[in-house]
A protein has these predicted regions:
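Well-ordered secondary-structure scaffolds
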Residues: 1-271
Length: 271
């Protein structure tokens, strides 16, 4: 691997953005491939917002939506990060990245293979190191967070969020029915337990309230107008009301994972 080689990251959600920011900060050339309708809830720290807005800024890093690789080159030349809509990774053979990071966090493999790049890394469960990809990075909060897995897989998804401020499952909110998500509150708002933060509008025009289970800061909220199904993750409340800036900063979890990815890429770079 050479310093000016392309590092391709599949996914632009908040955990992916932690890795993208770390690689960008290290002076590496990063290309992000995203879905056509990303569903990030921590939108203030997700480069996936560029798909909707044309651009995004996270902790000083600018991301820009591009349609061609020629446009991506222009974005790299000004020191920014290009984002392209390519959920299936069809551009990967054309890009020929030196390393590929699957940061989709789908809890399953959506099509990443070891032959996509000389070095392939996946974040979280759904991949087996040495089979699907070269290496896997643990994403579950706890003692093993960020651990590099060279054989085997990450801890399976438990469906139970990690504990923050004494709360786990209570801080994450899911849709109870299908419909269109309509925001009532905004990211950064201080909310009370039981407060309506959004509504789900069903085809018959009825709006069902989406309420919080705990008090705190609304750290994440799905984009207004997004279609949801039962169980769809739509919001995240941080009980630490004194830490409003967390809504706009990359999380400790994302930074821990990012450090492991950078370690692996740096080790390959300095071979």
């Amino acid at each position: 691997m050479k310093r000016d080689d392309v590092i391709l990251v599949r996914g632009g959600g908040d955990l992916a953005t932690g890795t993208i920011h770390r690689l960008w900060s290290a002076g590496l050339k990063v290309l992000v491939l995203e879905a056509d309708h990303p569903a990030a809830i921590r939108r203030q720290v997700s480069v996936s917002e560029a798909v909707y807005e044309g651009g995004a800024v996270v902790e000083g890093m600018r991301a820009a939506l591009v349609k061609t690789l020629d446009e991506a080159v222009v974005v790299w030349q000004r020191g920014d990060v290009p984002v392209m809509v390519d959920p299936k990774g069809e551009l990967i053979p054309q890009v020929r990245p030196a390393a590929l990071v699957d940061a989709i966090l789908a809890k399953k493999n959506l099509g990443t293979t070891r032959d996509m790049a000389p070095l392939t890394i996946a974040l979280g469960p759904g991949f087996t190191a040495g089979v699907d990809v070269d290496l896997v990075v643990e994403t579950k909060r706890g003692h093993r967070l960020g651990r590099i897995i060279r054989e085997g897989a990450a801890i399976p998804n438990t469906g139970v969020p990690g504990v923050i401020g004494g709360y786990g499952a209570e801080r994450v909110i899911h849709a109870e029915k299908a419909g269109v998500f309509r925001n009532v509150c905004a990211i950064g708002d201080i909310v009370s337990a039981g407060e309506t933060i959004a509504e789900i509008e069903t085809p018959d025009g009825i709006r069902t309230p989406v309420t919080t289970r705990i008090a705190g800061i609304l750290r994440g909220l799905l984009r207004d107008g997004y279609p949801v199904t039962p169980g769809f993750k739509v919001a995240d409340v941080d009980p630490r009301r004194e830490e409003l800036e967390n809504c706009f900063l990359i999380s400790d979890k994302a930074r821990c994972i990012a450090g492991s990815v950078l370690e692996l890429i740096a080790a390959d770079l300095w071979k």
